[in-house]
């Protein structure tokens, strides 16, 4: 009987220690939306809106094709960042566009807030993705790339190089 009680106490203490240890990262269950041609901005906004709709128990109704038609600029060949912000505000979101840092990603993801970031790979155009998670032990970013796939892993060094090339542009959108 004593051995069994000691084993139970040891298990409880180990379980509690495991819970108190820092988790290796964070991942948010953001709905994935793929893009139409030049539609990474609309798809990224749709992912953020659907995430918050799901959090509120509402139907996920963000229509990416309507957003693309509404926001697309032939002059830019895509969607301006200011138009993403304006559209989100019109839909009842508070927006905060900042020149982000790694700690900003960690801070907001830990609070359950996914982010849209702009990336620029090489000489290519700007590309919007949704940062849905981080693994800070392995220095990995988990991003939803509307032109690629859900939860695409990218090493921090590569991510930060592409993010820096886009001015570290970061957009936080939260429901009002």
Feature locations, PLM:
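Conserved active-site-adjacent core of cysteine acyl-enzyme catalytic domains
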Residues: 19-31, 49, 61-176
């Amino acid at each position: 009987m004593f051995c069994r009680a000691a084993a139970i106490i040891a298990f409880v203490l180990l379980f509690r220690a495991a819970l108190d240890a820092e988790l290796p990262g964070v991942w948010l269950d953001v709905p994935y939306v793929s893009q139409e041609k030049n539609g990474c901005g609309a798809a990224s906004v749709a992912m953020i809106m659907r995430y918050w709709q799901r959090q509120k128990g509402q139907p996920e109704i963000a229509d990416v094709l309507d957003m693309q038609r509404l926001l697309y600029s032939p002059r830019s060949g895509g969607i301006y960042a200011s138009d993403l912000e304006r559209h989100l505000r019109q839909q009842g979101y508070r927006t905060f566009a900042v020149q982000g840092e790694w700690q900003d990603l960690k801070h907001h993801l830990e609070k359950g807030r996914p982010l849209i970031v702009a990336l620029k790979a090489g000489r290519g155009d700007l590309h919007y993705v949704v940062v849905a998670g981080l693994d800070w032990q392995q220095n990995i970013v988990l991003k939803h790339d509307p032109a690629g796939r859900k939860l695409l892993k990218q090493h921090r060094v590569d991510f930060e190089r592409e993010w820096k090339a886009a001015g570290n542009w970061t957009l936080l959108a939260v429901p009002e």
